[in-house]
Every structure is written in C-alpha cells, then in structure tokens.
C-alpha cells in the first residue's frame, strides 16, 4: 500500500524539478549584475527587498534577486558559491517541501537562501537542528551571511534563561533544536506574566535532518513535568531486588520484539511470598503490579551502554538513532526509576505531567514548514499524510561513484568481529581512511577493544565521548584515520577526504583567540587568509586519499531503519569523491534474530563453516525485508500516537488560546460574572433531583453546598416563598437570579475595596491558577483513560471513538470545574485582611503549584510513546535495606490508623460533573492524600462521579476503594 502511495506522490516530480531549474537559471542570469555591486550596495539590498514586499511584491517575485544576493555574499564571507543544485534546493525549501540532498551536497549552505528570503517578511524564521552544537556552529558560520545583509541572528541553547531566549526569538533568524523550540512553546503556555513569554509566533521553519526529527522522534511526546505527591522511591528499590530472584521463561515471559513482559503463575507465587501478601491482584495491591512490570523491563529490555549509560551516578538515555546522550530525558511511567534502582543510583521522585505536545502537532502549527535530509524518499508517503510535505530529490552536483558492496553474513558475532578487524587492518595498512558504524555504545567499545588488541590506532565517538564529536568527524577522512562511531545520523560535520577545511580553519582562528561572537571584525578579516592556508595543506592529502579509494564505511550491523544505514553509507562518496561501503552481519544480530527468522533458518540450512561468510543478493534482500517490517510497525505506532494526540490537540489549542488571551490582558470581568451565573445554576440543577416542584428540592443541601463556593446572604426561607408558585425552568431561573444578584453585589463591594484595576489583575491571576491546575489534572485523567482504552476493542467498540467521546465529556467537566473553582477562590480571599493586591495575588499563586522545570523528550517505550520527567528539588535518601514485608506490614497498620503509605497509581484527578454534588472548597494537599481512610462507602454513587465526601476525587479513586 505504501509503495503505491509513493508512486502516486512521484507523478508530478518532473514538473516540480523543471520549476526548480527555472529558478536556478533566473538566479544565474543575475549573477554578473549582483557580482558588480559593492559591499555597501549589497547591504542595501535588504531594505530594498523589505520595501518591495511592503509595496505588494510577493516573495516568489523577489526570490531570484534575493538568492543571487545571498550567493554573492556567501562568496565574499565564506568563500563558497552556491551550485545550481543548491539553488534548486533553496527554491524547494521556500515552497514548503523537503529537499532530499545527499550527504556532502551542502544542505547547511542551501538553507541560507530560503531563510534570508522568508526573514524579509519580519515575522521570524526558525532553523531547526538536532543538537545545541550544530545550532551554535551553524548560527555562527551562516550568520556571517545574514549579518552582512543586516539581519539579526539568534540561537537557542539549553542553558539560556527566559530574557536571553526572548532576545534570540526576536531576531530575524533563530537557530535551535526541535526540543528547545517545542519546550519553549509549552513553557510559554505555563507563564504567569506576559513578560515571561519568549516566542513570537510560528511563521516559517526549516528542519535539518527532517526525517530524524519528524519521523524517528515523532513517537516521542514533549512533556514538561514536575514532582508528584508522595514518595514511593523505596518500592522501586525493593522490586529491583525482587526480580533478581525471578528466572526468565520460568517466572515471567519477555517479548523483545514488542518490548513487553508478562508475569507467570510461579513468578506470582514468589512475588507474593517475598512481599508477604495473599493476592497480588487484589485492588489494594494494583500499584505493585506496575512496579513489578517495570523492574522486569529494566532487567531484561533496557541494557546498560546500549539503551542508556550511567555517568556520575545518573542514568542517561542514549538516542537509538544517533547514539547521542539525551541529557534531561527520562522514560515514563516509572520505568526510569526502575532502571535507576537496578543500577543502584539515586532513585528520583515520580513526576506529574504539566504540559505536553507531540513533535507532529508542534511542527504542524507553522504557517510554512520545510525540511532537508539525505534520506527522505523512503518515508515520502508519511511526510505527505502527516505534514503535507512533498519530497523533492535534488540531483548531486557531481555523479555519485561510491561502491556499495553486498552484505557479508556470518554465523556468530565472534566470527563477524574477527572478519571486521582483519578488513580494517588491511585498509589501514594501505592508508585508506575507515569509518566503522556501530549500533550502540557497547558495540563501539567492543570493536575498539579488538582494534587495540590488533594495535590499530583509532578514535572512538559514542555517547560517552560526544563532547569531541565535531573534532573527531572533521579529521575522519584523513589518510590512515580509523574512526569507530555509533550511528552517524545527524552528526552534522562533513567527513572530507584530507580533512574538513572550514572546521580546521575555524578551530585555528579560535585557538588564536578570534571568534565571530567576541571579535567579529578580526575574525572576518583573518578568515580568508586562514581558509586558503588550510586549503593548501589539505589539498595534497585529499588527492592522495582519493587514489587510495576514498573513505571506506564499514557497518558492523544493520539498523532497524534503512534510512539510518543510508545515512551511514552517505558519509562516503561526497561531491563526486570515490568511496566504498559494506555491512557485516551475523545471525546473532538483533534485527536478524527478532525480525527475520526465516532468513536465519535458510542460512543455517546451508551448513556454513566457521568464519565463512555468505555474500549474496538474497541476503541483502532478506535484510531489507526485515527492515521494512520494522519500519511498517513503527509507522503504525506513529500514526496511532498522532490519532490520539489529535484529540488532545484540539483541546490544547482551545485552552492555550484562552490562556494566552488572559495572560495578555484581555478583560475577563464579563466572563467571571458568567462563571458565577453558570455555577449557581449548576448547583440548583444538582439539588432539584429532577423534580419540577421546588417543594421537592434539597434546599438544605443546596445552600450548604453553595456556601462552600459563594457565601450567599440570601435567606433560604425567603427564596422558597418567592418560588413557591413556580415550576421547572422558571423556578430554576428565579432562584438563580436571586442568588446571582446577591453574589454580584458582594463582588461589587470587593471591587470597591481593592479598586477596579486590582480586581481585574486578581481575576486574571485566579483564572490562570485554576486553569493550570485543572489542565494538569485533565492531562492525568486523559493519560489514565488512554492507558486502558485499548481494552474497549474486546467489547467490539472502537477504542479511538471511545477515547474521543469520553475525552470530550472529561473536557466539558474540566471547563465546569474551572468556572466553579475560579468563583470559589475569588469569593474566599479575605480582601479586608490583604494589605495590597500583590498579597492577594501571592495567596492565589500558592494554590497554583506551579513548577519551573526544563525537560526534554525521551525514547519510545513498548507502546511507541515516551515522556520526560524532570523533578524539581532534592530527593531525600531512604534506607535501601528496608524489608519489603515490613513495609507492607507498616502500610497495613497505617491503614488501620486512618493513614496510608501504600503506593497509589498517581496523583488523584479532581473533576466536577454537572448535576452531582459539586466540589467543596479545596482542602490542603496533605488532607487530600487519604480521604477514604475512614472506611465509609456511599452506595449508589457512580464510579466516575465526584465522591460525596467532598474531596473532589472521583468516587472510584476515593471512598469507592472501600467497596472492594
């Protein structure tokens, strides 16, 4: 099916390429004219273009002259002239496409063309890279073009504070990583002051390594989280010890392909004995199952130096696609804590989601989106379906002459590694540079150790040595160089035969104390001479390495994705240089073992001798089949993630839009008055019990409940007399009007006390505080709903439709709760005892439980989803030798005493359903922990209805637990 879609997408490709060629011709026709301009005349082009846009000219009309201007400035500042194919790539990006350009074709330089053109509109252009280093490096190097033309260039990096970030976003052009852009969007929608906002819209973005960011990381929601209530870290330590006593295939099952585990009956018995409980599956022990599953996953599915590394007592995730460490990222739902417990490092507290968005929905917010990569064609259908992005392959400037050899397959990893070392030794002796690509940190260290034994000098580049990444890659093409690296996707620095001229020139100038930030004039002055000096040094070695066959890329195993393999291969053969590539495989490699058992069986049937490889087209084809199976599975996961996030995205868009309006000073006084009226009416309907006759209403309950929200001065007996002869809607309306009139009078007195401006500011703060808390609670409830929604399929119901329906109901309940709690807070602040408006605001903000956390997204779990947890503050160390049975006993004793120390699934959601007893005034957080400990039940209450005890929790999450 995907292949058919791919063919359909390619039907108009010839016409598109013709348009791109015409742009290149138009730019070339202007070259002599633009080249004749002085520096001052070139600088004057920018204000001229801006004026033309103001006068009504389109960017398309300006494009040829703007591109010609950028090309000329590039020649004068960088010594680089855009090739025709680069001009074509620039036009493709301007028109909102993905330009597929092979490695070494100068994608970074290509981006300067549409970036400058679109920045002329003054709305900001975002250039998205895969890491902070590339963002800084590209903004420095390419920034020389923009600054020459009078453009401001900004760069967003992790350590920056909000004022600095705002300055960078206000620049004409801003470089940064996908995570930084996404998290700044989320943080802007958590801000309490207009002055705290940093972004200024989403006009145009160019995404470098677009397949890595929009495909590989699309399964990864960006999530900002903060500490949840309660400390359950000891349970992770206990279960880390417990699973060491369990045996795989005897006590539990593991499915490595799907990344899931399952506890078996013998294992259940051992767990119950260890914990001293009768039944693991009793409702009171539900949370223990989660700790057990995570502990088994941490033991069996997440391996040190492959999926993560441990550095300075911290578990750091390794990006499966690039081999880079992902600082700040944490697996979700307790998995990261389970890994920390397994490794014996500090177990950090569990977190609660405050804000979240997928990369897919973040980048779909841009008015115009474009991307660059060397490997997008295999995912063309997904780019079009998800992002409405076409993929346009741009031909290489010079013909590709790299030799891609067929794969060699061995029986065992040991045989494969021996053959690899032998091959590398031969080529190193000849002086040919070699790049060995590995799939994990562990593999790179094994290969490095074998090269050490063989006395082959080499450099290692993996997640543990990422600081020296650019320096290592820049010299990987020199004569005799041997470089061992984890996945090369997105490394960003070209491997040039003889060495990377620009990098070496930049490094030389910086070593002499000159940089584009601190000494821009001296740096620019010395750049041409230094560049020519380095070029002369590199030229002879470049020719020598070409004679030796160019860069030899050796893949030590196939990756799940064909694109990652193609990116590794693409490091060789740039700009018409010679090169060669080959992959070495074994039947023990994960891809072969998990996804192509049929091929493994066929190879084994041949009766291979030890050390004897098979080299055949059928092997390469079989590997490709396995990769397609994995890619298809991952695509389905990404589609599923997007379908569910689209439900949240509609809600998030409305909530964030309303929040921004409040934050930016929109007058919400009329909204507050409406909230008062709606809340009062909701309470009246909840008290009438469906009866049209006021005499049957629960008047005592109505006024008791109402007074927890609005301390009304209306007399109950007087109201009953007035509405005595009315029925139905008229009775409801009459009662509502009486109470609302009284509430408005009280509210007017409040305004007289603190002034109109003071009350408007207070209203804004209260709405922000309540909206933020209710939105967080809603996110938790939606996660809870999604976790179990798949089971609806067993009842012949579409889980997605059910999620949409119930999510809509929960959203409406949240809106009602926001109205009610806003009114409640405003009427319960003692204005007379508040000296200033700021004091009142402080009182409100204390209820907001706001957090200032910076987090980034993590790799996918078995469902293809992941989150980020970034806990704020210190975590107290607990005694790791606490006996589990003692802990269970303590919990039971505490429960009898009216307390609870057993773990719970997470922070309890708070909601309000119309027509039920409304939420009472919110208790302090310590009172919320165990309201059901008194043992009461309320027969007849719906599981999802608010608990009648007034805690604000759903009944099933509160006193409903006592019915079990």
Curated annotation (Swiss-Prot):
Biased composition regions of type Acidic residues, renumbered to the chain: 871-882
Membrane topology: Peripheral membrane protein
Keywords per UniProt: ATP-binding, Cell membrane, Cytoplasm, Membrane, Metal-binding, Nucleotide-binding, Protein transport, Translocase, Translocation, Transport, Zinc
Catalysed reactions listed for this entry: ATP + H2O + cellular proteinSide 1 = ADP + phosphate + cellular proteinSide 2
Main location: membrane
InterPro entries per UniProt: Helicase_ATP-bd (IPR014001), Helicase_C-like (IPR001650), P-loop_NTPase (IPR027417), SEC_C_motif (IPR004027), SecA (IPR000185), SecA_CS (IPR020937), SecA_DEAD (IPR011115), SecA_motor_DEAD (IPR014018)
CDD domains noted in UniProt: DEXDc_SecA, SF2_C_secA
E.C. code: 7.4.2.8
Subcellular locations according to the entry: Cell membrane; Cytoplasm
Binding site for ATP: 86, 104-108, 494
GO process terms (BP): intracellular protein transmembrane transport; protein import; protein targeting; protein transport by the Sec complex
Co-factor remark: May bind 1 zinc ion per subunit.
Bias kind Low complexity: ranges: 887-900
Gene3D superfamilies for the chain: 3.10.450.50, Helical scaffold and wing domains of SecA, P-loop containing nucleotide triphosphate hydrolases, SecA, preprotein cross-linking domain
Functional description taken from the UniProt entry: Part of the Sec protein translocase complex. Interacts with the SecYEG preprotein conducting channel. Has a central role in coupling the hydrolysis of ATP to the transfer of proteins into and across the cell membrane, serving as an ATP-driven molecular motor driving the stepwise translocation of polypeptide chains across the membrane.
Database matches in HAMAP family: SecA
Subunit structure: Monomer and homodimer. Part of the essential Sec protein translocation apparatus which comprises SecA, SecYEG and auxiliary proteins SecDF. Other proteins may also be involved.
Name of the protein this chain belongs to: Protein translocase subunit SecA
Source taxonomy: Bacteria, Bacillati, Actinomycetota, Actinomycetes, Bifidobacteriales
